[in-house]
Structure formats: structure tokens, C-alpha cells
Amino acid sequence: LHLSLRRQRQMCIRDRYDSIQVENGDTVEAIPVTDYANIDGKHPVLRCSDSRKLDFIPDESVDMVLTDPPYGANVMYSELIDFFHVWNYQSSIAKEIGFTEPVSPKTEEIIVNPIAGKDFEYYQTGITAVFTECHKKVKKDGYLVFSFHDKSLDSWLAILESIYSAGFCLKKCYPVQAETRTGAHTSNKNSIGIDLMLVCQKVSELSSPMTIITEEIVENAIATTRDFLISTLEKFQKVEAEFTVPDIQNIAIAEFFSALGRNYLSDMTSKHLVLSKLQIFLDNIEEVAGDFEITKKRNGWWSELYRQKWNINN
């Protein structure tokens, strides 16, 4: 029965998206340990705790931090995770891995939630604190890699300032099609379906000195971004990926600041030059995309499920 259900699900995905899930049967053997010194290929340390306090990890001992930070006010994570938290709390190893309370902690959660008195400044301060702690733990020239997307340029500037303030530099971005095309809150909308993996490298105070921004530097970054966009669109449309205008703008923002490095923070005059040029580029992003097909509203299983309820026409 399990196999037949799995095959049926795979066929549904194949019919709708012309793709199929592949299961290789590999298993993961892992026995959690409590002491960081005992970590090896089969013995991880599992913790459920505040990422601003990683005292159990020795400084400059980690090659790379891979994470997925909360997206501002997009999702109330702690409230949603309680469904799973209560089961983890009942686990035989609950106390060992940090599930010491029956529901998830919410007081210190890094999120934008006006009801809880948490504004955007609180969110940015929290993200910066986490990135700063990561900077302490990664080795010299180590990496911080995380996924991010946001329609707001202000949100991008906030996350970039957190990156730089913590002692990292954005080196590269990798667009990745999201696991699901849409959710209940983004169906039938001009939403973002492309995640961006931002690769940031640890820098020292003496390395990578800031350069005075000139119009030529900004134009070169724009040109690099344009070439990257065209190349990315070509790759994604070969597999029939959907692109909305916000998708393309997000890729452009990430690649632009990757090309620019830390320079845009050098002074307010330079910052104004950078942002004004970037905004013009973003406003004309459909012209940059040219003949590539741009999706006006996201399709997906939620859209199909609620099509009749919402009286959505094809």
C-alpha cells in the first residue's frame, strides 16, 4: 500500500509539473552526542536553542554555517512549530537536544510581530546578533550560507547591513527554485517562488578594504547583473520554471550586491548613487528579461485546490 501510494503521488507530480521525485533508498545512521569534541561522521550534536548563544561550539572551529533565517513578518514560526514541538517534547531524548518545555519558546523569537511588540528594528538587531555569533564560530575565511528572498529593497538593505556588521561579505548568490511553487498565502499572486542561497565569507578588518564608489563601478555591477540574469533565465526556463517580476528583481538585487561587495556602505553619497541606479534597473526589469516568459500569477497545488472556491479563471 505504501509503495502504491508513493507511485501515485509521483505520477501526479509528473503529470502536473513534468517532473518526478526520485528516491534512492539511502539511509542516514546517526547517534547524537552531547559533547562537541565527540562529533564525527556518525555522531552529530543536536540542539534546540537560541542561535545568539552558541557557547557549546569552540570559536573558529566551523568551516561553514548553513541556515535559513526567519523572513520578518512572513511566518509566525514558533506558533506553527508547536504542532511538531509537542511530539519532540515527548521524545526519549527531548532533554538532551533542548526540548525542555511543552511548547516552543516565543519571548525571544527573532521575528516582526506587532502584537508581541517586536518591530523591524528588533528583527534586524536579532539577525545581526546571530550572524555575529556565527562569525565567532567559523574559521578564518569560513562561510555563512543562508536562503533569503524579499520583495522589499529595504528588507534587502537590512539583511545586507546585518551581514556586513557581523564581519561577513556577500560573495555570491545562487537562485534555487522553491520546493513548492506556491502556498496558501501566495496562490494566484505575483509572488516569489525562487529562493536565493547567499554565500557570505568571513573577512578581517584589514582584508578587502572598501573602495570609493564611482559611477563606473556601479555601471559595471549593473552590467554583470544583466549578464547573470539572462544566463539564469535561460537555465531555469529550460526546465519550465515559473518566473514572476519579483523573482527576477530578487535575483538582480542579490547578484548586484555580490558584484559590488562591501563598497556600497562606504558613505551616504555612494549609497544614494548605488540605490538610485539599482532602482532604475529594477523598474525596467521586464525590458531586461526581453522575450523570456514572465508569469503574472503563481500556479500550484493550492491554486488548483481553491480554484473553484475563489472562482479563478485560467
Give the residues covered by each predicted segment:
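Long, compositionally biased intrinsically disordered regions
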Residues: 223-314
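SAM-dependent methyltransferase catalytic-core segment centered on the flexible catalytic loop
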Residues: 46, 51-55, 60-140
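Single conserved hydrophobic/aromatic residue that forms the stacking wall/gate
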Residues: 1-15
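Flexible, glycine-/basic-rich loop-and-beta segments that form/coincide
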Residues: 183-184, 188-236
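Hydrophobic alpha-helix feature that most strongly marks membrane-spanning transmembrane helices
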Residues: 70-71, 85-92, 132-139, 143, ...
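A structural signal for short secondary-structure junctions
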Residues: 38-41, 137-140, 188-193
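Segments forming glycine/polar-rich beta-alpha architectures that bind adenosine-containing cofactors
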Residues: 41-66, 71, 287-314
